[in-house]
Amino acid sequence: SGMNFAVAESGAIGLVTNEGNARMVTTLPRVHVAVGGIDKLIPSFDDAMATLRVLPRNATGQHLTSYVTWIAGGVPTASAPDGKKSMHVVFVDNGRKAVLNDPILSQALRCVRCGACANVCPVYRLVGGHRMGYIYIGAIGLILTYLFHGKDRAKALVQNCVNCQACKRS
């Protein structure tokens, strides 16, 4: 699975969905591997709750999303030989440490990936996500794609931007 955040004080990860798909894919297998950028690591549950106040409101206009799944290690199961699932958390750097050390660029890693900047983008509304991002969409997608994947991948995003700055106001 991915992760919306990983809580350093407990080792738990948080998954936020509306359909419960993340809960399903973490429940079924005997081995759960959660992968996320080092920018997903937050100090405490208080920080996780602050993210939960912002993410659903900006992404879908909800006060709280339908499913918030907390996972802290392997859980008991009858399907595993030793009676317990195993869990592994993998943090990806991919240039994030360098970005974290930059006082201006590090602000991009504070994005919770809610999609609000894409939802207000007139070009995104017309052409959809496949033309507006390699992995990350919207205005923040342009910045993150450039930082993590280079200017060649980000070039198409820049060419699509009409500089209306609706994303900045969102």
Language-model segments: what does each one mean?
Residues 1-103:
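The feature marks the mature, well-folded catalytic cores of soluble enzymes
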Residues 36, 40, 109, 159:
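Conserved aromatic-histidine-acidic binding/catalytic patches
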Residues 55, 108-109:
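Generic hydrophobic, helix-prone segments enriched in Leu/Val/Ile
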Residues 47, 113, 163:
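Catalytic-loop motifs flanking and including active-site residues across diverse enzymes
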Residues 109-112, 116:
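Conserved, hydrophobic alpha-helical core segments of structured domains
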Residues 79-108, 123-170:
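Ferredoxin-type iron-sulfur electron-transfer modules in oxidoreductases and energy-metabolism complexes
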